A protein has these predicted regions:
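N- or domain-start disorder-to-order transition segments that initiate the globular core
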Residues: 1-23
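Charge-rich, well-structured scaffold segments of protease-associated domains
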Residues: 6, 17, 61-124
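M16/MPP (pitrilysin/insulinase) zinc-metallopeptidase core fold and M16-derived inactive scaffolds
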Residues: 20, 25-89
């Protein structure tokens, strides 16, 4: 059964438990997609999506990828017209670590000039 909670900060949390399933997914959805961008900002949401995988204040991109591998995470993100989503799928016992990594990516990402230059060529 789907459970829905509203946090004090306005975020909505949805939980769905499926008996007998040992995998768990965490996804963070943001109402920020291409339709929210002006012509001068075109590609910004997609650019930021890529940059969040380029490392954090405490983890290089290689270390971040290594930590994801260590916990067996399938991690990805996408940007659509309406939203941007970051997600990981792991074994249920690894969910705390997956949530910690996603939080680190969202709150502590490094926007390294070299990485930004590379991603500008890919995205913009």
């Amino acid at each position: 059964m789907l459970e829905k909670y509203k946090l004090k900060n306005g975020a909505t949390v949805l939980l769905d438990h499926v008996d007998g399933v040992r995998s768990a997914s965490i996804g963070l959805w943001f109402r920020a997609g291409s339709r929210d961008e002006t012509p001068q900002e075109a590609g910004a949401a997609h650019f930021i999506e890529h940059m969040l995988f380029k490392g954090t204040a405490s983890l290089s991109s290689a270390e971040l990828a290594g930590r994801m591998d260590d916990i067996g995470a399938e991690a990805n993100a996408f940007t659509s017209r309406d939203c941007t989503n970051y997600y990981m799928r792991v074994l249920d016992k690894r969910m705390p670590e997956a949530a910690e990594l996603l939080a680190d990516m969202l709150f502590n990402s490094r926007f390294d000039e070299g990485d930004m230059s590379t991603e500008r060529g890919v995205i913009l």
